[in-house]
Amino acid sequence: MKKIEAIIKPFKLDEVKEALQEVGLQGITVTEAKGFGRQKGHTELYRGAEYVVDFLPKVKVEVVLADENAEAVIEAIRNAAQTGRIGDGKIFVSNVEEVIRIRTGETGLDAI
């Protein structure tokens, strides 16, 4: 099994969610996140004072799925989240050893 974590721009969430549904993914976890990379921050003026905003708002999308579905999901996320500008985000892929559904005790792919 694979865990795919994608850090994307918040306004791209609906497009990513729809793309994941189109490739047959049934569940996702979404978390608000803040961060910066090459995009860095920017300065804002608030009540006459200039502030540096280091961390930019992002959204983290997480999915766990069968190995054979990983490439389709990665492509769906990449195509839906891409704007071609700095700050589009990152996709991280890692192996998952086990999944357990708390309610039933099911394990492995049955628990996803």
Swiss-Prot record:
Annotated GO MF terms: ATP binding; enzyme regulator activity
Keywords: Nitrogen fixation, Nucleotide-binding, Phosphoprotein, Transcription, Transcription regulation
One Pfam family recorded for the sequence: P-II
Keyword Phosphoprotein: yes
GO cellular component, one term: cytosol
Biological process terms in GO annotation: nitrogen fixation; regulation of nitrogen utilization
Xref: SUPFAM superfamilies: GlnB-like
Modified residues (O-UMP-tyrosine): Y51
Assembly description: Homotrimer.
Membership in a protein family: Belongs to the P(II) protein family.
Described function: In nitrogen-limiting conditions, when the ratio of Gln to 2-ketoglutarate decreases, P-II is uridylylated to P-II-UMP. P-II-UMP allows the deadenylation of glutamine synthetase (GS), thus activating the enzyme. Conversely, in nitrogen excess P-II is deuridylated and promotes the adenylation of GS. P-II indirectly controls the transcription of the GS gene (glnA). P-II prevents NR-II-catalyzed conversion of NR-I to NR-I-phosphate, the transcriptional activator of glnA. When P-II is uridylylated to P-II-UMP, these events are reversed.
Full protein name: Nitrogen regulatory protein P-II
